[in-house]
């Protein structure tokens, strides 16, 4: 299936890729009015980033850096240079500008979803997000997209794929609400009960390219005839998933909309809580104690992403909205580690950056919100080769008009994107 999907993606974006790729070995100097050092929080005026062989050679004030002779200069004017951004919760195969209604997905096959995912990946990169973590895509479409992008037959961000989401029978991730025998699922498709079958489910995802495991520990907004706040999986089952993933050097993200499920998942050792729409003092204390990240997805909860969805989904969304904002406020105030994630696919692809302002509305500073999408996200992924504009790191660089520390909405207007030294977007 993965090979068929990659072949289907092959014609896409080739012309754009050839048009934007620089000559190999050519040194490039990016020059802008400002550069944000996300580690120190300092804005450096009249700044340059020197790029060679896909990596950052130097970054800082122009006066302190000797540009290589013969380098190509890119003049970006009144803009701020930043590291490429991360979105830690995306579903590339669903959603998008032409594919957003719940009922449309019922009639799509995996190739339809993969082609849709290719366009969503392009939109995501053009918005300045050079790395994304998949929160699950059926048929290993996220794995196929990762391969297609790495091979140069599609344009998009660096993808950390998850494969199928891990769910209990009847849980969020299973197909609920249908007659017996319709849309039945297997451990290979992520639906499993008990340690033995969960081992099979986790190992199968990793075998076929998953680099993170997504575990559903509560109900979800899209579940038919199932409550959202039910605890899914026993403690033993959660520990089985976490232990097996960790044995394979793979991290675990846990979808959770209930307080009870969050507490159990954190105690089981997951690396991040996704959504976390119901938290209390005990939950934030435990998350701080264990070093568990929160990926809060306020873009999903505070927008109108579900306006065209069935009534049962809108009702659950209203339930989540009533408590999600206060939970995020509590987490920010308590100092829980937060990484940036939008649930793009339910929230719109390519509009990921609108979430920065929402995080600021919940008490984060603009710098803290940017760090959530750079340094913190890189830490959660466990990668040390990106997330800042440091010499030796991958040349993933974006630029925005103006100063994002003064106006966080500037991040919604990325107009320069470089990934691995290749320029994919430039100001007109």
Model-predicted segments: where are they?
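Bacterial N-terminal signal peptides
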Residues: 9-21
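Histidine-rich, glycine-flanked metal-binding segment
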Residues: 35, 40-82
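C-terminal cap of metal-dependent C-N hydrolases
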Residues: 44, 373-375, 391-428
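Metal-associated gating/positioning segment near the N- to mid-region
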Residues: 79-153, 169-174, 236, 260, ...
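Histidine/acidic-residue-rich catalytic or RNA/ligand-binding cores of hydrolases
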Residues: 96-99, 223-225, 262-268, 298-312, ...
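His/Asp/Glu-enriched, well-ordered alpha-helical/loop segment
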Residues: 105, 247-251, 312, 320-403
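Divalent metal-dependent hydrolysis catalytic cores, especially in the metallo-beta-lactamase
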Residues: 116-142, 155-165, 210-223, 251, ...
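Alpha-helix-loop-beta-strand connector modules within alpha/beta enzyme cores
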Residues: 147, 151-165, 229-254, 291, ...
């Amino acid at each position: 299936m993965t090979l068929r999907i990659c072949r289907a993606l092959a014609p896409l974006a080739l012309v754009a890729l050839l048009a934007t790729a620089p000559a190999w070995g050519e040194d490039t100097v990016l020059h802008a009015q400002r550069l944000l050092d996300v580690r120190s929080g300092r804005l450096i005026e009249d700044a340059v980033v020197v790029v060679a062989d896909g990596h950052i050679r130097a970054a800082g004030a122009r006066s302190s850096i000797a540009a290589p002779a013969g380098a190509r200069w890119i003049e970006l004017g009144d803009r701020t240079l930043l590291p490429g951004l991360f979105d830690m919760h995306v579903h590339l195969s669903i959603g998008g500008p032409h594919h957003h209604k719940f009922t449309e997905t019922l009639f799509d096959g995996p190739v339809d979803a993969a082609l849709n995912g290719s366009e969503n990946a392009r939109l995501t990169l053009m918005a300045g997000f050079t790395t994304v973590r998949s929160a699950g895509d059926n048929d290993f479409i996220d794995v196929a997209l990762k391969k297609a992008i790495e091979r140069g037959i599609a344009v998009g961000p660096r993808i950390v794929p998850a494969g199928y989401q891990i769910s209990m029978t009847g849980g969020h991730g299973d197909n609920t609400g249908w007659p017996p025998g319709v849309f039945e699922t297997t451990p290979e498709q992520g639906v499993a009960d008990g340690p033995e079958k969960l081992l099979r489910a986790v190992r199968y995802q990793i075998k076929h390219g998953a680099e993170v495991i997504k575990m559903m520990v509560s109900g979800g907004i899209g579940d038919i005839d199932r409550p959202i706040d039910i605890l899914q999986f026993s403690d033993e089952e959660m520990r089985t998933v976490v232990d097996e993933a960790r044995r394979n050097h793979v991290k675990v993200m846990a979808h959770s909309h209930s307080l009870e499920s969050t507490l159990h998942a954190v105690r089981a050792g997951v690396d991040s809580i996704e959504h976390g729409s119901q938290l209390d003092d005990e939950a934030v204390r435990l998350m701080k104690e264990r070093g568990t990240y929160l990926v809060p997805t306020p873009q999903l909860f505070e927008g109108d992403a579900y306006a065209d969805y069935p009534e049962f989904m809108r009702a659950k969304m209203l339930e989540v909205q009533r408590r999600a904002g206060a939970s995020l406020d509590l987490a920010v105030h308590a100092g829980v580690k937060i990484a940036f994630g939008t649930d793009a696919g339910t929230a719109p692809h390519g509009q990921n950056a609108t979430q920065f302002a929402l995080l600021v509305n919940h008490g984060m500073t603009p710098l803290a919100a940017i760090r959530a999408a750079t340094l913190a996200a890189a830490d959660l992924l466990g990668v040390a080769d990106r997330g800042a504009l440091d010499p030796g790191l991958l040349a993933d660089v974006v630029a925005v008009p103006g100063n994002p520390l003064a106006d966080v909405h500037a991040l919604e207007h990325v107009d320069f994107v470089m990934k691995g030294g290749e320029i994919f977007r430039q100001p007109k």
